[in-house]
């Protein structure tokens, strides 16, 4: 085990939970352009676009976990995706070489596969459809090139998570759970489409598992908590967790899309963004599943089932009193 670990970009949602679970097991420092709400004492302010800052920050470390990324849908200019996600990765690797660091864990994304693929595993061809996915794939290629220069000495682990949810997160899964829990949810379509999801408490434990088992070599993993749920099953999970009956209203898909187009037009007229759009209706009704056989046969055992992760999130967000109002925004 390599005990000295630098987390890059760990002031956000996943990084905060990773610090929480790993701080007792490793000598950890966080390098981020934002201060950490919960771990300021081990956080150094820095940016992956700043080579000098990286060169200095990596001194004395054995392993890097690279979490930093531009990931929002509305990043402008779009060149930021490539400046941070691709060139930032190059900068990190350059700093690693200067400091003799040979181990890196990189969080990529299932976005590298593109839309509407049938349960892709790690060997599925890449076909990213947006700048985020394209930049993540390019970053992976940079990492593989680095690894291939000294494969017997270097360790590269690439983790491609599906959508991650959990306590304090403000993203698409939270918005969906909030609508269901509040009784303001209307199912578009039959509700039989499946969605792959990942609970933050599990993915950070997998990263910690890989940190405890660093070895020379290259591995890539999809991360999904199985089994996948369809939308009807997700509503049932919310009902069970909150012990309340959720109104069951199904809107036919054509009507849902019509409503989405109406909001598209309204958005163009007013210049405002709305929670409903034709793209979101289409995504909501699509089956989005990814194969995670490899990660779940790697020796890692997730501490929570998907149902437990949902229950923990729902109880924290909609039942129990909160100690603070700190949240993390994602897509």
Curated annotation (Swiss-Prot):
GO terms for biological process: galactose metabolic process; glucose metabolic process; lipopolysaccharide biosynthetic process; O antigen biosynthetic process. Keywords: Carbohydrate metabolism, Cell membrane, Galactose metabolism, Glucose metabolism, Isomerase, Membrane, NAD. InterPro entries: Epimerase_deHydtase, Lipid_A_modif_metabolic_enz, NAD(P)-bd_dom_sf. Its cofactor is NAD(+). Involved in biosynthesis of the repeating tetrasaccharide unit of the O-antigen. Catalyzes the reversible epimerization of the hydroxyl group at position C4 of undecaprenyl pyrophosphate-N-acetylglucosamine (UndPP-GlcNAc) to yield undecaprenyl pyrophosphate-N-acetylgalactosamine (UndPP-GalNAc). GO terms for cellular component: membrane; plasma membrane. It is an enzyme of class 5 (isomerase). Gene3D superfamilies: NAD(P)-binding Rossmann-like Domain (3.40.50.720). The gene is gnu. NAD(+) binds at residues 13-14, 34-39, 47-48, 109, 132, 136. The active site is at residue 132. SUPFAM superfamilies: NAD(P)-binding Rossmann-fold domains (SSF51735). Substrate binds at residues 109, 132, 183-184, 199-201. It comes from the Bacteria. Its EC number is 5.1.3.26. Belongs to the NAD(P)-dependent epimerase/dehydratase family. This is N-acetyl-alpha-D-glucosaminyl-diphospho-ditrans,octacis-undecaprenol 4-epimerase. It is found in: Cell membrane. Pathway: Bacterial outer membrane biogenesis; LPS O-antigen biosynthesis.
């Amino acid at each position: 085990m390599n005990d000295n670990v630098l987390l890059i970009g760990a002031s956000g949602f996943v990084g905060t939970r990773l610090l929480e679970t790993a701080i007792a097991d490793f000598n950890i420092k966080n390098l981020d352009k934002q201060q950490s709400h919960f771990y300021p004492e081990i956080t150094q302010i820095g940016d992956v676009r700043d080579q000098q800052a990286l060169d200095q920050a990596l001194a004395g470390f054995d392993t890097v976990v690279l979490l930093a990324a531009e990931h929002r849908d509305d990043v402008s200019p779009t060149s930021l995706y490539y400046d941070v996600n691709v060139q930032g990765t190059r900068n990190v690797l350059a700093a690693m070489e200067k400091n003799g660091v040979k181990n890196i864990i990189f969080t990529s994304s299932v976005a590298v596969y593109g839309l509407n693929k049938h349960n892709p595993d790690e060997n599925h061809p890449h076909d990213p459809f947006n700048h985020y996915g394209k930049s993540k794939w390019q970053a992976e290629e940079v990492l593989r090139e680095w690894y291939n220069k000294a494969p017997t000495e270097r360790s590269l682990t690439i983790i491609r998570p599906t959508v991650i949810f959990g306590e304090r997160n403000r993203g698409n899964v939270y918005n969906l759970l909030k609508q269901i829990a509040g009784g303001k949810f209307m199912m578009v379509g039959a509700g039989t489409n499946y969605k792959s999801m990942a609970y933050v408490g599990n993915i950070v434990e997998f990263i910690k598992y890989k940190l405890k088992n660093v070895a020379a070599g290259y591995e890539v993993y999809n991360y999904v908590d199985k089994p996948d749920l369809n939308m009807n099953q997700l509503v049932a999970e919310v009902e069970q967790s909150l012990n309340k009956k959720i109104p069951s209203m199904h809107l036919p898909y054509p009507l849902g899309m019509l409503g989405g187009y109406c909001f598209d037009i309204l958005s163009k007229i007013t210049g405002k963004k709305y929670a409903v759009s034709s793209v979101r209706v289409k995504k909501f009704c699509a089956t989005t599943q990814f194969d995670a056989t490899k990660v779940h046969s790697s020796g890692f055992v997730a501490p929570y089932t998907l149902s437990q992760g949902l229950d923990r999130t729902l109880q924290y967000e909609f039942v129990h009193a909160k100690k603070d109002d700190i949240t993390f925004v994602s897509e």
